[in-house]
Amino acid sequence: MLHHIEIYVSDLSKTNEFWEWFLTELGYVQFQKWDHGISWKHGETYLVFVQAEERYLDVPYHRCRVGLNHLAFHARSKEHVDEITEVLIEKGIPILYQNKHPYAGGKNYYAVFFEDPDRIKVELVAPSMNEGIS
């Protein structure tokens, strides 16, 4: 089981504004907060966002470089994916792969894909009828 993930960000304030509503919607609660970071916990796992030092901001994040590609979260249902999609649109957050949405991951993969302020790709995936089948 995953204990935690720590992500360094370019602007902690923007990051928290972006992630707070989404993580709260998924059942996460604020766990820790300090001058240069914040964490959100769900069960025993938590997600940490830390302000990167100025000297490390010159090379922006890109998901195709070595390192993290994206974060994927469980949705409660297809309807939940649709509800979150509507909120994203209301907030002006672009939906990735719009021409294939909500099946950008495949015909049996109902999800919404979007990016946070640092362009970290985020995915919210509905349960599949095929999950658990090997």
Q: Which role fits each region the language model picked out?
A:
Residues 1, 64-68, 106:
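Short glycine-enriched loop/turn motifs at secondary-structure junctions
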Residues 26-35, 47-51, 76, 91, ...:
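Long, contiguous binding/interaction regions
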Residues 9-14, 72-117:
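Vicinal oxygen chelate
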Residues 8-53:
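Core segments of cupin and vicinal oxygen chelate
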Residues 1-16, 71, 128-134:
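N-terminal beta-strand motif that seeds the catalytic metal site of vicinal oxygen chelate
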